[in-house]
Amino acid sequence: MSYTSYILAFQLCLILGSYGCYCQDTLTRETEHLKAYLKANTSDVANGGPLFLNILRNWKEESDNKIIQSQIVSFYFKLFDNLKDHEVIKKSMESIKEDIFVKFFNSNLTKMDDFQNLTRISVDDRLVQRKAVSELSNVLNFLSPKSNLKKRKRSQTLFRGRRASKY
């Protein structure tokens, strides 16, 4: 790699690094704006302990953590939807939703739309209840870890095959 390439790579790292700091600074500012608007820094907010943080700390495995994170993200989307008419904090909420979109949904709009559609389904609707029960066995099949067993068996077979060929 030539000297010029090193300089260009270094400049690119600086630009990308400063952009990340800028985004994080903006996100921090918007979060602080929401806290101030909702008076979330007062002492009574601490009563009863944290709402989500202890739960997040208890769930260590990535797949388990994703389940909890999805419930928490769902809560925040409902919260933002509840506060959508408050013009003073609208920009802050949009910035935070954008950050959630990037971090949780990997910037995939279809995933986010599907997620939001799921959170809007009314459990009180009798037709929805009937549809959900009708689909229950299929959903349970999706939830079962069968696909992991197939992958594990396939990799074990490949591993055994390689080991056998060595001897």
From Swiss-Prot:
Native source species: Oryctolagus cuniculus
SUPFAM superfamilies cross-referenced by the UniProt entry: 4-helical cytokines
Entry similarity comment: Belongs to the type II (or gamma) interferon family.
InterPro entries: 4_helix_cytokine-like_core, Interferon_gamma
Principal subcellular localization: secreted
Protein's gene: IFNG
GO MF term set: cytokine activity; type II interferon receptor binding
Stretch forming the signal peptide: 1-23
Tissue: Released primarily from activated T lymphocytes.
Protein name as catalogued: Interferon gamma
Binding partners and assembly: Homodimer. Interacts with IFNGR1 (via extracellular domain); this interaction promotes IFNGR1 dimerization.
